[in-house]
């Protein structure tokens, strides 16, 4: 597989940004390019939670899933890609279990905001065909905006995309919401990461809920304390490669069941096709 491969079933990417090692660890971009890529893969393969038994291709398909036959877009960065889980994330587990087709537009280290290259906004406009038919559009609330201290911005009184400052978190989210509503006309779902030590990301989560009131999108809130409280410290250490990125086991046994339950509800309530 190349660093960035995209087709109807899967797409993935890695960042080419120049970052310090500390930033790389947080952003999930370590090993994304050059010789570091092989080192990253070897390091991830040694993690118990990434053992072959947890691979997505060993996941059994469910019968009569509400998501079966759906077409779902996933937009995100390293957590959506699966940077610490050998390129497999909740996307592959959900698709394998539920029998839907998908596009995964995920590039490690990228931000929602256009303040940095290869942003969510830019890739949504340039890489996702506006004529494609999607039943759901799922977008990650990126931790990279928090790590890079992208300005939060303010909620606009306007619904016109030209009025949104996409160099801010708020403007980027509003732009995505407006764009999805115009071109794909399907339910939009944002998902957060599980709780870690970041006041800035906590502010982004709060902002996301405020924007929900304006735009009416759905939120799968993994940041909620109850999600972290649902696993023991021992399980957490097994499920998470670092405070941001799950292992294969973390996606399969922790994140996927939560996301699946919420996507079932959303599909049953809002998907007409």
For the regions a language model picked out, list residue spans one by one:
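A short acidic, glycine-rich active-site loop
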Residues: 158-169, 241-246
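Short glycine/proline- and charge-enriched loop/turn segments
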Residues: 153-161, 233-240
């Amino acid at each position: 597989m190349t660093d960035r491969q995209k087709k109807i079933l899967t797409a993935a990417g890695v960042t080419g940004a120049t970052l310090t090692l500390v930033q790389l660890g947080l952003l999930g971009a370590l090993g994304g390019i050059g010789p570091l890529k092989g080192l990253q893969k070897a390091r991830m393969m040694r993690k118990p939670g990434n053992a072959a038994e947890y691979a997505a291709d060993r996941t059994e398909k469910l019968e009569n899933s509400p998501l079966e036959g759906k077409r779902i877009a996933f937009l995100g960065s390293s957590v959506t890609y699966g940077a610490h889980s050998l390129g497999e994330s909740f996307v592959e587990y959900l698709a394998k279990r539920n029998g839907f087709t998908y596009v995964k537009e995920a590039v490690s280290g990228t931000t929602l905001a256009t303040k940095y290259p290869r942003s969510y906004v830019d890739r949504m406009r340039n890489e996702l065909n506006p004529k494609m038919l999607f039943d759901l559009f799922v977008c990650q609330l990126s931790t990279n905006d928090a790590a890079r201290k992208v300005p939060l911005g303010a909620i606009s009184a306007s619904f016109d995309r030209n009025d949104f400052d996409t160099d801010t978190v708020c403007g980027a989210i509003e732009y995505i919401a407006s764009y999805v509503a115009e071109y794909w006309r399907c339910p939009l779902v944002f998902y957060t990461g599980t709780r870690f030590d970041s006041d800035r990301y906590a502010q982004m989560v709060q902002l996301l809920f405020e924007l929900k009131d304006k735009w009416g999108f759905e939120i799968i809130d993994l940041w909620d304390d109850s999600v972290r409280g649902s696993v023991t410290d021992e399980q957490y250490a097994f499920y998470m490669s670092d405070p941001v990125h799950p292992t294969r086991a973390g996606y399969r046994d922790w994140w996927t069941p939560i996301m699946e339950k919420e996507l079932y509800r959303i599909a049953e309530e809002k998907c007409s096709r």
